[in-house]
Amino acid sequence: MTDKRKDGSGKLLYCSFCGKSQHEVRKLIAGPSVYICDECVDLCNDIIREEIKEVAPHRERSALPTPHEIRHHLDDYVIGQEQAKKVLAVAVYNHYKRLRNGDTSNGVELGKSNILLIGPTGSGKTLLAETLARLLDVPFTMADATTLTEAGYVGEDVENIIQKLLQKCDYDVQKAQRGIVYIDEIDKISRKSDNPSITRDVSGEGVQQALLKLIEGTVAAVPPQGGRKHPQQEFLQVDTSKILFICGGAFAGLDKVISHRVETGSGIGFGATVKAKSDKASEGELLAQVEPEDLIKFGLIPEFIGRLPVVATLNELSEEALIQILKEPKNALTKQYQALFSLEGAELEFRDEALDAIAKKAMARKTGARGLRSIVEAALLDTMYDLPSMEDVEKVVIDESVIAGQSKPLLIYGKPEAQQASGE
């Protein structure tokens, strides 16, 4: 096709679709006996884009994975936490099934399945949420509950969470309404006591109150992209009842609250069961027995707990689990560093005793899987600094002494004869 203003006879040309003359448009594209202007081309593009948007949800509906498939995918990236994976798989499946079929089924209204994850630092709470969003191909954003305050106070408003989600999907409201929001450190907004306070608690109970409607489902008014620069623009209306909220926290001390309830409820006097010290449950076993009343005693308000009906507890990772995390998942830490070293033409080998030493160090720090990267990074720092300037390094070997800081990694060089032969 060619861009024409006039035909060979000098006759005025018109768009075959909208009828505008060549003087009323910027471009007029000629085909066999027909013409189309740039405005009609733009209009056609808009129509096609709208049709693609309408077709996309139907594709998503047919692609909803089953709980078994969700669990299997989580197994590829997250080690252990079997019960938490099962709980998450069912809750996420039910949530998106609810969206697919509408809020009602046979006249029965389907409630939201927002999730509360309870587990120590580095046990995989954030990774589980991220992996779910990646599997389902939905927008995902994280928020830190400690930065949130009630509207009108210094800090971040809860509505900013929805704005972040919109940013992740280029302000496409329909996409955002199918997204996942992970709110971390939710235990840090517990009120100071389990009795209602007459004083203002803008970063504790106040934030819980502010989050209530957002998590349960409301229409949040969010300024559009560049909203502050263009205050005359209308706000975007986002229905949060379709967004899956996952809240997570370490809840340090919750095990003691549960233990007190369990021991108090076991009875006193001659008929009571006397437990030896050795029979005391571990922290993970206690957290698995969590009840709403325990969370209320911890400092969450009853209304907030009611908006998080699905509770999954995660155990503290064992030394064996940390070793598995280092080498087994698809994006395992050792695989990541091996890929980095391969870009420099060198092979990176972690000996088994090195992995044991890394896991022991992380256990001592009580940072869970989160502390593994900093330990490996410290051990490899000097090598990663020097390697790009070095020649002929074929292999780097990491053993226990390197992790302990007692020696440097073993560097294995290529044979000089091979270099000379290649040079000839």
UniProtKB/Swiss-Prot annotation:
Residues 2-56 form the ClpX-type ZB domain. One of its GO terms (molecular function) is ATP hydrolysis activity. GO terms for biological process: cell division; proteolysis involved in protein catabolic process. GO terms for cellular component: HslUV protease complex. Pfam families: AAA_2, ClpB_D2-small, zf-C4_ClpX. ATP binds at P120, T121, G122, S123, G124, K125, T126, L127. The keyword ATP-binding applies. Gene3D superfamilies: 1.10.8.60, ClpX chaperone, C4-type zinc finger domain, P-loop containing nucleotide triphosphate hydrolases. The keyword Nucleotide-binding applies. Keywords: ATP-binding, Chaperone, Metal-binding, Nucleotide-binding, Zinc. Component of the ClpX-ClpP complex. Forms a hexameric ring that, in the presence of ATP, binds to fourteen ClpP subunits assembled into a disk-like structure with a central cavity, resembling the structure of eukaryotic proteasomes. Belongs to the ClpX chaperone family. NCBIfam families: clpX (TIGR00382), PRK05342.1 (NF003745). ATP-dependent specificity component of the Clp protease. It directs the protease to specific substrates. Can perform chaperone functions in the absence of ClpP. This is ATP-dependent Clp protease ATP-binding subunit ClpX. It comes from Klebsiella pneumoniae subsp. pneumoniae (strain ATCC 700721 / MGH 78578). The lineage of its organism: Bacteria, Pseudomonadati, Pseudomonadota, Gammaproteobacteria, Enterobacterales. The gene is clpX.
